[in-house]
Amino acid sequence: MPRKIRQLIADLESAGFAQVPGGKGSHRKFRHPRRPGAVLLSGPAGDDAHHYQEKQVRHAVREVQP
């Protein structure tokens, strides 16, 4: 069963990512001080996440963990 967008947001925030301005509509942009670039999530918080979004978040969280 796919995870919800809100669960991916919680994973990013617990890893130290912060939401920054720049997303339009249901797009949200997250940055981390130790990681270059941004992670972009699209879709309402209650929607199911696509597999590529889950993979993107999982990879970003692994990059910043010590």
PLM regions: where:
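Basic nucleic-acid-binding interfaces
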Residues: M1-G22, F30-P66
